[in-house]
Each structure stands twice: as C-alpha cells, then as structure tokens.
C-alpha cells in the first residue's frame, strides 16, 4: 500500500447485507483491517473508516416476505447481531457506520448527477442503467477488456455488463424518485455513500473480498470516475476466500460456519490468529486441524503475556516497528516468522507489544494489583532457591491471569 506522506486516511469497506447471520469468512477483511489500523495508529496515522450496512436488497425482501415481517424488522435484527459479533471478536467499531436506507435521498441525487452527465439510459424494463462504454478506462480495476464485455445482440452499442443504477419496482420496500418508484442498485449504493461521506475525494484505501473485484469494485470505480475524473481509491486491499473443509464457504451452498457458532465453540482469538498468519489474498481452508493448531498457538501466546510479569525487559522498539510494518504491507507470513524468532529469543516485552497492536483479546488478561505482592514473594523464593513454593505461587498467579 502506498501511504507515503499520508497521515489522515480515508477508508471504506463494504459491510454485510443484513438478511441473515454473518459466517466466519465474512469477517476476514474486517479482522485484518482491525489489526492493520491499530498498526497504522501506532505509526501516527489517523483513521477515518466508513462501513456500510446494506439494508435493502432482493434477498432481504424475499426473506422478510417468507417470515411475514417487514424489511425493517428483519434488517434491524441482523444489524444488531452483526454489531454483537464485532464486539465478541474484539473488532473496533468503524468511525462511521451508515445504513443504505438512511441515505436514499443522497443516492438519488448521486444518480441524477450521473444522468445529467449523460452516463445513463433506460433498459427494456425501464430501469435506469449505467453505460460502461462511456468510461474509456472501464476494466482498469479488474483487468477486463471492454471488447469482451460487449453484447453481440445490440450491435456493439451496449454492454452486457451495463448495470442498474435505479431498479423500477414496487415489490417490497421501494422509494419515490425522479426515475420512478423503485430502489437503488448495489454498486451505486456504495459509490454514492463514498462520494457523499468523503466529499467527492478518492479513498486512500478501499477494502473487500477478492470476489468483489468484478463487477462490484469495477462498477464503483466507473461511477466515481464518471463524476470526478479520478479513481474511487488510490489503494485496494482485498482478502482471499475462506473455504470450509475444502469447499467454498457460502450460504447458497449451505456450507457455512456462522461467526456466532464459532464463538460459542472456540476462543474468538483463534480466527484472528488464523487470518493474521496467512498473506491476505491467499485462500484459507478452515479445518478442525487448523483451528486446533491455532488454539495451541493462542495458549502459547497467553503464556508469553503471563511470563512478561516475571521478566519485564525493555521492548525492542525497532523489532516492533519491523513486524508491524510487515503486517501493514500484507506480508503476514514473514511477520509471523519474525514473531517466532522473537519467541525463541524470549523477547516477551517486544512480543506482547506486537500482540497489543494486533488487538488480540488475550492481551486484556492481566494480574491485578493484589497479585503484585505475590510476584514479589515469588522473586524472593527464587532467590532463596525455594523452587517448589515458588512454583505453587506461579500456578496460583496463572489461574488469576487466565480468569481475568
């Protein structure tokens, strides 16, 4: 990521479509962001992070009708569930979270600007559509060739990938607009929110999964370029797929591990450890064996934070900086190699500082002030070579630490 000479970072990450519970794979990007943002703050960066909630969508309408409740009831439930998940997995809330339905007027204004500039037309369903052929660099985000996107049935005057800005419909939740009754398209929702919140500026960083590169990120960029002549983001951060037992994790395939179910069964720090151990774009195959290995690793990390109380050497600031920089650059495997080297060298203060910046929940574990007296007693017993009594105190303190 090229963040040179930037101290105030404008960042966006697409949020969930709130018609069901999020699965563990949905959390990969935001957990990585949570850790990287803390690393950036450690270097003096200020983070302005916008995260959206898609609370109007065909899937939402279908689910609400199936359950016999309103879209608002359904989305309120799953939005609150999502916020609970963020808390459980120790993910800091973004600077600003915005629901699409709260910004319909802004989205309509945004679409009007695109129409006024001549980037739109009405399709056979009377939906207002964006004409991608009006964007000379369409495909720059995804590497698509514009020639391959042409629709052979329209004599090369239209593209099969022209996308809906405003869908004309009265099914489910819909809104009044200059384009008729309907609701906005997904690609436009995100682009309009970015344009509004960041005052037409390009983002310093846009995040999302690799599955969103085309068409979602490409279409966001096309709209922003149409209105400003600039890309929607100067840097992109994308995370790879999370598979479950060798198969794609997807609700449509009924092959998911819900985040809430993971947290009921395992320590949430385990998934943070997994996500931060593998370079971001590399696919992860989540298995019981992988979870078990990282469970052992978290226990090891907890012990290191406990050992720090007995040997508070000065942290090596340059080593902390080196590791955090590697995480910022997305070189997770190399960063973890250096952490293992520091563990071998018993640099507990340095390692603990790194873990604090990666926002592992276990860093909140502590020994209370009353325990400090026991540590003094332990030191005295060690000096007196009364190792059996010292060991008893250490075991007592470990219990206090684990339960803190």
Swiss-Prot record:
Does the keyword Ubl conjugation belong to this entry?
A: no
Stated EC number for the protein is: 6.1.1.16
Q: Which reaction does it catalyse?
A: tRNA(Cys) + L-cysteine + ATP = L-cysteinyl-tRNA(Cys) + AMP + diphosphate
Q: What class of enzyme is it?
A: ligase
Placement of sequence motif 'KMSKS' region? 248-252
**Cofactor-binding details, from the entry:** Binds 1 zinc ion per subunit.
According to UniProt, the name of this protein is: Cysteine--tRNA ligase
Tell me the organism: Mesomycoplasma hyopneumoniae (strain 232)
